[in-house]
């Protein structure tokens, strides 16, 4: 009997394929996105040492009081603006965008646009 893969399993396979090519360096770290049903998370990671340099999500206290809903496009854009601001403060200007196996559409695109508005270069 043929079993159909779940959406999340397909996303994970796509993400593994993309991660073979996308690698964060100290000069150009990786901006990684994770999307759940209620929240969106973003991290800037240096893959050579395996450390998270900057992170932001809809769970951050400064965004929690500002946002009414944490699962919509406006919330994702705010997370993008916040991670961009924090990255610029740490001296990070250029990043490689890792969409996490998700389509570049909706909340993922809004986060990327917010990060670009804050001054990050992809």
Curated annotation (Swiss-Prot):
Part of the 50S ribosomal subunit; part of the 5S rRNA/L5/L18/L25 subcomplex. Contacts the 5S and 23S rRNAs. Keywords: Ribonucleoprotein, Ribosomal protein, RNA-binding, rRNA-binding. This is Large ribosomal subunit protein uL18. GO terms for cellular component: cytosolic large ribosomal subunit. InterPro entries: Ribosomal_uL18_bac-type (IPR004389), Ribosomal_uL18_bac/euk (IPR005484). The keyword Ribonucleoprotein applies. This is one of the proteins that bind and probably mediate the attachment of the 5S RNA into the large ribosomal subunit, where it forms part of the central protuberance. SUPFAM superfamilies: Translational machinery components. GO terms for molecular function: 5S rRNA binding; structural constituent of ribosome. It comes from the Bacteria. Gene3D superfamilies: 3.30.420.100. PANTHER family: 39S RIBOSOMAL PROTEIN L18, MITOCHONDRIAL, LARGE RIBOSOMAL SUBUNIT PROTEIN UL18M.
């Amino acid at each position: 009997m043929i079993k159909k893969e779940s959406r999340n399993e397909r996303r994970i396979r796509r993400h593994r394929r993309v991660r073979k090519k996308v690698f964060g360096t100290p000069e150009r770290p990786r901006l990684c996105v994770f999307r759940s049903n209620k929240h969106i998370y973003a991290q800037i990671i240096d893959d050579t040492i395996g450390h998270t340099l900057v992170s932001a999500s809809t769970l951050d206290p400064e965004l929690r009081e500002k946002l009414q809903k944490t699962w919509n496009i406006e919330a994702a854009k705010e997370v993008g603006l916040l991670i961009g601001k924090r990255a610029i403060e740490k001296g990070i200007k250029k990043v490689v965008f890792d969409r996490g196996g998700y389509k570049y559409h909706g909340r993922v695109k809004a986060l990327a646009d917010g990060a670009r508005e804050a001054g990050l270069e992809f």
